């Protein structure tokens, strides 16, 4: 049996099942407390704070049925675990914001728990971000009262510095944050950058401003969880500690498609870089267009962003390439040309140096 609504997890466990002759039952919510007419040998689950689910899983464990959890939300529940390293995911999100020069950061979540605490630990390693926890500040409100959450966010936004980079724990929280910001006239990404702490392409791409996400490689985690469950069903002892794997990458979308700069010359240079990639803009031509010397432009960009003008231009090329690679219809040669690389191999070398992936592996 598998309990998980995430498509990549379902696909991965289904693949393992086909390869190993499993018969599957999927159950997103337990409803009355147990899956209808299910008798089986093992469970891959996402264990949450659900009283009925916990009671049923305890019952299965008492019968000797092995369970593998794909989350880290309930470390107190005794079972095997395979999950992404949430601390590293938080660090990855912080680095993404800092690369874009967002200096004021906040972690927003509806509730608190072990997974969120681990995200926070990684995110806060990059500085001193704020922490917005709805349940802590509004303990008498229901977590799914979106009107109450939206009104609370309005109060938080009123006193928050801008531009602000916000990491959310879940995809739904990132959509809620975007909706509240748009209702209040807060520009995304110019005034507010948003990163979701989990990827859901169907949800995050279908927003008025598509939302950047940490790719937690849930498909890999689900496949490894299924492999572990098979070993447990074959009689192997459960690992003494949770199995963790690193987050795969940041999937950059428009919600962080900005580089924050207070220097007007630097902002103008960034806009020139971004708009002139296809035509082969370089630092020299940008400096001429802005009426300054190359040295002046380089000095001002370095002072504002902490990197050279050439490094910022290369970063803009890679940002464009990554956005285009996200669409499988775009051939690598087309992506290279549109992003200002001389060839597909030039793009491949730059991408490998940046994140260790080839163009084809990046889009997988």
Where are these regions (language model features)?
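Bacterial carbohydrate/catabolite-sensing allosteric modules
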Residues: 1-47, 51-289, 298, 315, ...
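Basic/polar phosphate-binding segments, predominantly the helix-turn-helix DNA-binding elements
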Residues: 283-313, 336-361
